[in-house]
């Protein structure tokens, strides 16, 4: 597209400057012409007049560079034209890109409300021929373009094997897998090889510290000699060398865990017998290497933080299930050389005991841990190890520590970061209270996820942040068996305050949130659902919202556990969040997510099936490439034997990418059956990808047959249930807003089904009607109310005809009773700036159904209004340049009654008052926020009294229920 900005004054001045510099005969040094006109861009050699390397292209080059004669002035004038045209095209392209970026930034600077977004889509549909034509064309174009991009990326990756597409971590891990099968002594000698590169040049002393640990596990061997002093100097001065060593040392710890798994099955009795003699050297090591580890932490804090953490508190395992140990549990066993025998002995002893309760630490170990923590506190502790948090994936925990240190350094160094404060880990805040927590019912998870390893395990992230999370909050709210009681949440809150031994920034925000003024469980649940809705619309914004309110830990491992454990998250949006290559935090979360998965002894396509069951691998080709790359890295780590079958580990990545293309081609409805990929086509596409060699034909045939029999699918989420409801509704679909239009798609990532019930529509409340007349089936979503009528009943299914739909924003619920309708419900519209009008009247079959439905409806209305209020405040603060503090939304809490209904006057005041908004945004104390909320409170004729207890979401029980 031609851009008018190309003829701007800035572009013209740049062109004139380019022309002047060329006339004067100076060497060109601008960015636009460097790559083409610099002598270094061409090889030395004889030049022929007709070649592209003719002296005509060197008219501006100095004579001393290549000994070329620039020619007479007339020739210079003639040959300057290609240079000027090329510069003009580059500058024009830059101006066009700047204009596109500027237009995008302007369009994204203000976020429209949901109804205006629907209206915007509606106008586009009208412009391009109507809803059906537009959506069909858009779907076809998008599918074709994505398929084209995927094929293009695959060809690029297939033809550029020499680029080493996989990250250096996997390449290094592939080289180091030789050590993991040669013996544990070589593993441990290489484990600290990267850590010898430190500012203090204490590599030899560190090797002396490590040798007793290696001797504990096997016969004494000689460690690798430390690098020469010249290597140390180069490592200090060259950032790239230091980074490569750092990555190498990090990846070696993963290989240690892999080697440890085989050792545990073969040498467990010998290690049990050697536990007694291991204890004393380990205790001596605790006192010796604290100082050395401190010095190393200064240069490699992200490498040694988890080692400090492990030496301060030896891992105390919980009861383990009877199944085989996962990769996370085996990773626990060899985090530090001296701590490994103790863990094995404890785990072995615990397996014999076969207890179902949490294993408490002995008093001596507790006192030892207290003393060690006082003597040597780690620089950064996000979630310190404890009895109830050992079952967390330690690989992910270490990943969060080592990655988070980079964020803390970028925030201003150790002194500037709240988490690096010297008093953040005071000894007085170290009580060990986790075993007192009552065990909660287990949450069923897939066996490969090392999140809740056994039936009664409770991870620390879940125990700390789960009181605002239950199934009624998360997804469809149709299951009420896991709803937490308010009393239990308050008791867990009090225990949680004692459990956390480190004070962090977000923990302080959590303390403020748990104060008595904001301890209302209803509001907490509402804000958690708002965070889920924001995530399902814009994942980064949702994660930030949940972190600010303390629902999710502010670490990559905490966010990874949240994405894998919690319901109510769109798997499509999880893939969007994890596939974001622009933000380092998202990439670290993706690494932690794949670290939670164990692909050992699995075929590549089956491992990819397990990965895609939790994350939807679909969308932009670059995001798909990023997800497949992370999966391939994890698969290489879990299956070193499979990797050694190939000449290059990149082959795993190429093959996984080809499997995704095969699955898309085989099950896409847009591909005709005769054009679907055949087995020979699949094999032909993968010829020579393994450094010129072919992948074994038997392997490719097995992959093709398994994909042909069973599609790679993503597990169901809350969107799946909405899609089922959408398929049951025939006729015109809901419009999704208060504006009349052509309709919209019902199933969206942020939309979830709250409840379904049967009511009777009342055309005129003052006139009686026959019993059972105007029967309506009501589907209540979190932002939409859909009224349908049974269209056709079959033996195993039922279809509904669409009648009406209403947006929940601005809706009010009123109750009425008369001699004709004892359980009347009236829905009115009270959007600020619009007239109040009656939307529809219903009559419930009984008072219980009316109460349940109105409670759910009022809470959903409050959720929508709170989201809109959050959007408006964010936009106003963005326009005014006011930075919203993390708890500014608390100013709106007191404006809401217990059931969550706001009056129209309250909405008008809250949205129109600029000064009040500014004050609430800048309020720094909870008292100010409370008083501001009390001043803005209004009575609502349609709201229930504040003393009415909120009923959690429960499904009503009509004759027909959607599952």
From Swiss-Prot:
Give the modified residues of type Phosphoserine. 89, 105, 107, 180, 249, 253, 512, 515, 892, 924-925
Enumerate composition-biased segments (Polar residues).
29-38
Q: Which residues carry this modification: Phosphotyrosine?
A: 911
The residues forming a coiled coil are: 848-879
The record's listing under InterPro entries reads: IQSEC_PH, PH-like_dom_sf, PH_domain, Sec7_C_sf, Sec7_dom, Sec7_dom_sf
Ranges of biased composition (kind: Low complexity): 471-489
Query: Where is the protein situated, by its record's location annotation?
Result: Cytoplasm; Nucleus; Postsynaptic density; Cytoplasmic vesicle, Secretory vesicle, Synaptic vesicle
Q: Cite a single GO MF annotation.
A: lipid binding
The protein here is known as IQ motif and SEC7 domain-containing protein 1
Give the organism the record lists: Homo sapiens
